[in-house]
Amino acid sequence: QWQAFEAGSRAVGSFPSNKLQDGSRIAVIGAGPAGSMFSYFSLKMAQAVGLDLNVDIFEPRKFCHRGPAGCNHCGGVVSESLVQRLATEGIMIPDGVVQRGVESYTLHMDVGDVEIATPLLEKRIAAIYRGNGPRHSELSDTQSFDGFLLQLAEERGANLIPRLVTDVRRDEEKMHVICADSHRDTYDLVVLASGANSRLMEILENQSQEFQSPGRTTTFICEFKLGREVINETFGPSMHVFLLDIPRLEFAALIPKGDYVSLCLLGDDIDDELMQLFFSSPEVANCFPGGFIPEHVCHCYPRINIKAARPTYSDRLVMIGDSGATRLFKDGIGAAYRTAKAAAKTAIFHGVSAADFKQHYAPLCHGIDKDNQVGKVVFGFGSLVQKARFARRGRRRRAPRRSGTRGRTHGPPCRSPRSTRRRRARRSR
């Protein structure tokens, strides 16, 4: 049976062999960014200290498949700072994975639109290809971000096991991983990186009174296929963010990527009523060609982590990424990187007992939790701005506008600065 996470039938860190040794086995459940990065870092660190480990990654999905089998339920936006951090780790993201460099944010409100350039016009964020999610998308040779990270882990020596894990149990000093096809195996450390949409977290919560799975809320993500030329003309190199007075809506954005535009709605349990209010807003329709919102080619209602698991570790068990602690409504990939590296460092250099994770891994999770408390205040202030028209006008006036753009209320579809310059050139002639 599932036993105490931090205290109970065993004292914290009471396992006598809490250090990984040559031949130790690690099971990583989930090959998303968190799971693949943990595998990469743990094998890299183990090699540095001369430790021979066996790392198995359990992942039934294939990221090149169309439809749900290849979908990662994510908007796929990373900051330039994260790209640079990964580069210092030897992880150079291929150009094909980055679908578009985002040069600005376009803020849409009922009082007008404002385009806000990034500092020094640097490309501070990037829209990446997470997987072949759209059901009617064409087969693509483009490598996904998740597939790229998984390949790096495999090149380091990780083994990919295409099985769905349905249970994790402890027996004496070992952990047992049980799969849907009744396959089971024994490991010295289990790393949960299955994400917020996995039922495995609920199963573990039912087995232990000490464990609380991450707090979650329902979101909405969909894809519009418009083609590169139309996207370049109407959306440009900008991420379009909406500040609308819609109850329970905390964040909404249209993100251009290749031939598709991704829509992400985040808030308090997104439902049909909220979505209808959003899609009926003229500010949204005006972003599309002709002021008409086309049918989306796929959609999903993924759950996201809004509160860390309690606790995020136990003897020979650690939870990372969305399974453990992540940033509120943003930078989930960045949090996956931070938690994966911290957990790997703890396991390789310190040990795999609850005491080791409490001392060397838990402080990072607590720090993320504190950041999220501040984030809730910021989002609360944003909700007040959404409700107060005078505040939205003030926000529009104070925004550092980019040259060649102007605020617009219910005007024609939003266009890129390039198309704006072409129209002005035609007028001058």
Predicted regions and their residues:
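Extreme N-terminal leader/targeting segments of oxidoreductases
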Residues: 1-26, 41-54
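Glycine-rich Rossmann-fold phosphate-binding loop(s) that bind the pyrophosphate
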Residues: 31-32
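Predominantly flavin-linked oxidoreductase catalytic cores and closely associated redox partners
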Residues: 41, 151-286
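Glycine-rich FAD pyrophosphate-binding loop
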Residues: 43-71
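N-terminal FAD cofactor-binding segment of flavoenzymes
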Residues: 62-114
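Short beta-strand to alpha-helix junction loop
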Residues: 74-77, 122-151, 199, 222, ...
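FAD/FMN-dependent oxidoreductases across multiple families
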Residues: 98, 184, 269-347
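C-terminal helical "tail/cap" subdomain of flavin- and related membrane-associated enzymes
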Residues: 348-429
